[in-house]
Each structure stands twice: as structure tokens, then as C-alpha cells.
Amino acid sequence: MENIEYLNEIQAVAGKLIHSYGVPVMITLFLRWLASIVAVFLMILDQTKWKYSNNIMASLLAPYLFSSLPIVIFQVLRNGVGKWIALLTVILRLFLPNHFHESLEIPGATILLIVVTPSDIGAIFRDDLRYTGGDVCLLTSFYLINKHTKACGGIKNSFTQKDKVTYSICLWILFVYPILSSFAALFYL
């Protein structure tokens, strides 16, 4: 019986959010979270043994994450936690290069990018996805999809070969997010 009460409360909260912000904003917010999770997943997947022979250039995911990371996570990384992680990254990289694993290069660079970027430049790339930030996300995701599709031998092969399906789905999610968020931006102009 308590489970039903929790579901009713969640439904009421979701209804209030949709009523106050609107459906396009909620869809954009959901897609922003999903795209960020997928970008982190691809970054992790690229450093594991499960990856296939096509290197997806995970370094391009750093600017994508910078411009599409949800504001809550971005502010946490930009303030206290991110500064400590960036400091540890720099110390390990400079003074203990043998102990700094190669798989930590791109995540460390992403955290450094988030922490070190000046507020004015960060606002240009983050606040409005219709302009610069959206362009970065769209161009990055388009390049990654194009490279992945060519390496697979076409769109059909990228979805039929079992070792490439995960990459294909994740890259298409990264591509759909900036397009749908720009369409959603038309509704609240």
C-alpha cells in the first residue's frame, strides 16, 4: 500500500513540474541527463577491454560533456569536488607519471576543462544550447556517428553487428539530444 502512495506522490510532483515548466523543457532536461550519462558511459567503455577495433576518439566527448552536463553536476564539479579532483589529477600527472593510468587522461582533462574555464566562456558554451554549446554538441556527435558508421561499413551494419550496437545506440542518443533541444527551444522563444 505504501508503494502506491509513493507512486501517487511521484506522479503529483511530475505533474507539477510539467505544468510549471512545460513539456518541451522537461523533455530537454531529461535528454540532457541521458546524453551526459551516455557520454560518460562511452568514455568509460572506450577505456575498457570491451571496446571494438574502432577507436571513437573519446577525447571529443570532453567538450561535449562540458557543454551538455546538467547544471547540478556542473556546479558541483566546478566548485568544491571538482577542484580537488583537478588538483589530484595535476599532482599525479606531474609528480607521479608512472602511477597515472592512461585511462584517466580524458576524464582528468574533462574535469580540468570544467574547473579551469573562465565563467564568461563557460556561460557562452553552457547557458544557451541554441547557439555555441548546441553547435559543439551537434558537430561532435555528428563527427562521431560519421566515423563510427564508416568504420562499420554503413548504418545497417552498425546496428546488425552485435559488438557495435551499443556504440551505435549511444552515439545516436548523443546526436538526437542537440537536435531535439533546439526544436524544444523554439517553443519557449
From Swiss-Prot:
Cytoplasmic side stretches: 46-55, 101-104
Record's bilayer topology term: Multi-pass membrane protein
Assigned keywords, A-Z: Cell membrane, Membrane, Transmembrane, Transmembrane helix
Main location group: membrane
Localisation: Cell membrane
Cellular component, GO annotation: plasma membrane
Keyword Protein biosynthesis annotated: no
Transmembrane regions listed in the UniProt entry: 25-45, 56-76, 80-100, 105-125, 169-189
InterPro entries: COR413 (IPR008892)
Extracellular side: 1-24, 77-79, 126-168
UniProt xrefs under PANTHER family: COLD-REGULATED 413 PLASMA MEMBRANE PROTEIN 1-RELATED, COLD-REGULATED 413 PLASMA MEMBRANE PROTEIN 2
Sequence similarity: Belongs to the Cold-regulated 413 protein family.
Protein name, entry field: Cold-regulated 413 plasma membrane protein 3
Source organism of this protein record: Arabidopsis thaliana (Mouse-ear cress)
Native organism taxonomy: Eukaryota, Viridiplantae, Streptophyta, Embryophyta, Tracheophyta
